């Protein structure tokens, strides 16, 4: 007889917290949304709620459970609702309110509380018999389905909201296009993927992982951010920051290698981004010059999160064989368990390439290159400083347990003498002028993109949307494989 895991799930005591709140703007209106993290057993997900929704739940519960003496912060009639201290204080009060809800079974089993926390949504329930990859692909799955927009909710995005101007990139599943939003004339990079190709290659988990990671990127200056995601019956759309300083790969091809001070600057910004991802239990796994963009003034922006692995803490490991051959760490090639330190190996490989012009163990024959990565000693040529030699040797250490970053992760990178002349606080605030400026002419300048892409004709099919084919965050999505893909920020807060 099969065990009823759903019943186990419902009997579990949830834990909740409000890690952050965000201010949103649309049509000159400002509003605050509180991000609630819900954990039950092996499952975790985010629910986005406005103050009005907390207030409604509170008023329902206080009538039914007067002895509980529940409290939430009062509505503010006068004063600045967006004062940081006020928002911080309100968030703390709302956090205390939901903590009280999960202390007592009679409260957290109340239908309104379960609905508020989305506890009965089937996609949040996990079967202990599932393997690690299956569980992690569902973890923190579908932020968008948890946004309760109410009767005046945000209209979903759709292809006809944009003018698609140029092809600026291509990948295995589709194209990246420069697009201008008709509403306000803002420029975005829109990644358009063919569902059929994704499904045929069984890559839907990676696409959903990419979407989940993109939603968490908004807090870091060196990671590309997601504005919208939506889908039609045939395609998936990511609406992203348009970063038009060109790929690091593009500039490396033109210049062969970079001076050490320039390579150091890029390596530091890349390391900062990787350190942030590691801090939220994400391993990037695909660092390479093609995935490193420069913005309009020359700062680094990491993109393409399809190979990211979620839910990996510093002491955790995973085993999936993935990445780009030139940058694979030895433990990945050996199909051994690996951890965050694969990203530090990749940082070493990219830094080596920036300084010397080629990846450290490069060979046209992939089998021979793998053998080089596994067994060949690192070759360091003259022309760089002793601290550069040192960090390359420590990052490109074949034994992951002895690699720089193995013990204290990003902190070890920060403290290496190679970065001694650099202020990390200034770096993350973009106070250090980039050593190279791409000199873009404007927000729609595409000179730093390969003409092999930009001269292509924009496919008409990416621009087409009809009402029956659009699927968005507020309705049941047509294809179960991509449930939770769509995302749009909420449009207004009823009680600021």
Curated annotation (Swiss-Prot):
Residues bearing Phosphothreonine are: 320
Recorded GO molecular functions are: ATP binding; calcium channel regulator activity; chloride channel regulator activity; phosphatidylinositol binding; potassium channel regulator activity; protein kinase activity; protein serine kinase activity; protein serine/threonine kinase activity
Looking at the record, which segments are called Disordered?
Answer: 1-21, 121-156
SUPFAM superfamilies recorded for this chain?
Answer: Protein kinase-like (PK-like), PX domain
Alphabetized InterPro entries for the sequence? AGC-kinase_C, CISK_PX, Kinase-like_dom_sf, Pkinase_C, Prot_kinase_dom, Protein_kinase_ATP_BS, PX_dom, PX_dom_sf
Describe what happens upon changing residue 486 to D: Increased activation
- CC per GO annotation: cytosol; early endosome; recycling endosome
Task: State the reactions this protein catalyses.
Answer: L-seryl-[protein] + ATP = O-phospho-L-seryl-[protein] + ADP + H(+); L-threonyl-[protein] + ATP = O-phospho-L-threonyl-[protein] + ADP + H(+)
Enumerate composition-biased segments (Polar residues).
139-151
Every PX domain range: 12-124
**What's a Pfam family in this record?**
PX
Q: In which tissues is it expressed?
A: Expressed in most tissues with highest levels in pancreas, kidney liver, heart and brain and lower levels in lung, placenta and skeletal muscle. Expression is higher in ER-positive breast tumors than ER-negative breast tumors.
> Major location, coarse class?
cytoplasm
- Span of the annotated motif Nuclear localization signal: 195-205
Tell me the keywords, alphabetical order. ATP-binding, Cytoplasmic vesicle, Endosome, Kinase, Nucleotide-binding, Phosphoprotein, Serine/threonine-protein kinase, Transferase
Question: How is this chain modified after translation?
Answer: Activated by phosphorylation on Ser-486 by an unknown kinase (may be mTORC2 but not confirmed), transforming it into a substrate for PDPK1 which then phosphorylates it on Thr-320.
Where, by residue number, is the active site? 286 (proton acceptor)
Q: Does the keyword Hydrolase apply?
A: no
Which Gene Ontology BP annotations are present? intracellular signal transduction; negative regulation of extrinsic apoptotic signaling pathway in absence of ligand; protein phosphorylation; regulation of cell growth; regulation of cell migration; regulation of cell population proliferation; regulation of DNA-binding transcription factor activity
Regulation: induction: Induced by estrogen/ER in breast cancer cells.
Record text on activity regulation = Two specific sites, one in the kinase domain (Thr-320) and the other in the C-terminal regulatory region (Ser-486), need to be phosphorylated for its full activation.
User: Domain named Protein kinase: which ranges?
Assistant: 162-419
What does the annotation give as the result of altering residue 92 to V? In a breast cancer sample; somatic mutation
Q: Which residues carry this modification: Phosphoserine?
A: 126, 129, 486
Tell me, in a sentence or two, what this protein's role is: Serine/threonine-protein kinase which is involved in the regulation of a wide variety of ion channels, membrane transporters, cell growth, proliferation, survival and migration.
* Name of this protein: Serine/threonine-protein kinase Sgk3
Which species is the source of this protein? Answer: Homo sapiens (Human)
In the UniProt record, the gene name given for this protein reads: SGK3
């Amino acid at each position: 007889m099969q065990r009823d895991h759903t019943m186990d799930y419902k009997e579990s005591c949830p834990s909740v917290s409000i890690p952050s709140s965000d201010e949103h703007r649309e049509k000159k209106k400002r509003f605050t949304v509180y991000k609630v993290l819900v954990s039950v057993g092996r499952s975790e997900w985010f629910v986005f709620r406005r103050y009005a929704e907390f207030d409604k739940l509170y008023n329902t519960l206080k009538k039914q459970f007067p002895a509980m003496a529940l409290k939430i912060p009062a509505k503010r009639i006068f004063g600045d609702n967006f004062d940081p201290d006020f928002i911080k204080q309100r968030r703390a009060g709302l956090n205390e309110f939901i903590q009280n809800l999960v202390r007592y079974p009679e409260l957290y089993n109340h239908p309104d509380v379960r609905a508020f926390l989305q506890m009965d949504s089937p996609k949040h329930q996990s079967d202990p018999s599932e393997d690690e990859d299956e569980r992690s692909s569902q973890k923190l799955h579908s932020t968008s389905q948890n946004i309760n927009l109410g009767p005046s909710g945000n209209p979903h995005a759709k292809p006809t909201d944009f003018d698609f101007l140029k092809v600026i990139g291509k990948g295995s599943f589709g194209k990246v296009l420069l697009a201008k939003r008709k509403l306000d004339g803002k420029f975005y990079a829109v990644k358009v993927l063919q569902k059929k190709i994704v499904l045929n290659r069984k890559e839907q988990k990676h696409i959903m992982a990419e979407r989940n990671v993109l939603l968490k990127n908004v807090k870091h200056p060196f990671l590309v951010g997601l504005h919208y995601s939506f889908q039609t019956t045939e395609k998936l759309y990511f609406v992203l920051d348009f970063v038009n300083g060109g790929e690091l790969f593009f500039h490396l091809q033109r210049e062969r290698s970079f001076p050490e001070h320039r390579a150091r600057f890029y390596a530091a910004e890349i390391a900062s981004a990787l350190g942030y991802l590691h801090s939220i239990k994400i391993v990037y796994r695909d660092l390479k010059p093609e995935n490193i963009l420069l913005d309009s003034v020359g700062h680094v922006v990491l993109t393409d999160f399809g190979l990211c692995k979620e839910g990996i803490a510093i002491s955790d490991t995973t085993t999936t064989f993935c990445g780009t051959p030139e940058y694979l760490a030895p433990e990945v090639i050996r199909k051994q368990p690996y951890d965050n330190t694969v990203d530090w190996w990749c940082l070493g490989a990219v830094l080596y390439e920036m300084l010397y012009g080629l990846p450290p163990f490069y060979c046209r024959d992939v089998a021979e290159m793998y053998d080089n990565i596994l067994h060949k000693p690192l070759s360091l040529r003259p022309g760089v400083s002793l601290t550069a030699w040192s960090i390359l040797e420590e990052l490109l250490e074949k034994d992951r347990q002895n690699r720089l970053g193995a013990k204290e992760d990003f902190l070890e990178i920060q403290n290496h003498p190679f970065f001694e002349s650099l202020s990390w606080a200034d770096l993350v605030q973009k106070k250090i002028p980039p050593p190279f400026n791409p000199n873009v002419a404007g927000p729609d300048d595409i000179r730093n993109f390969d003409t092999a892409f930009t001269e292509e004709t924009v496919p008409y099919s990416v621009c087409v949307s009809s009402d029956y084919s659009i699927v968005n965050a507020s309705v049941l999505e047509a294809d179960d494989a991509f449930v939770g893909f769509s995302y749009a920020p909420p449009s207004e807060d009823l009680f600021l």
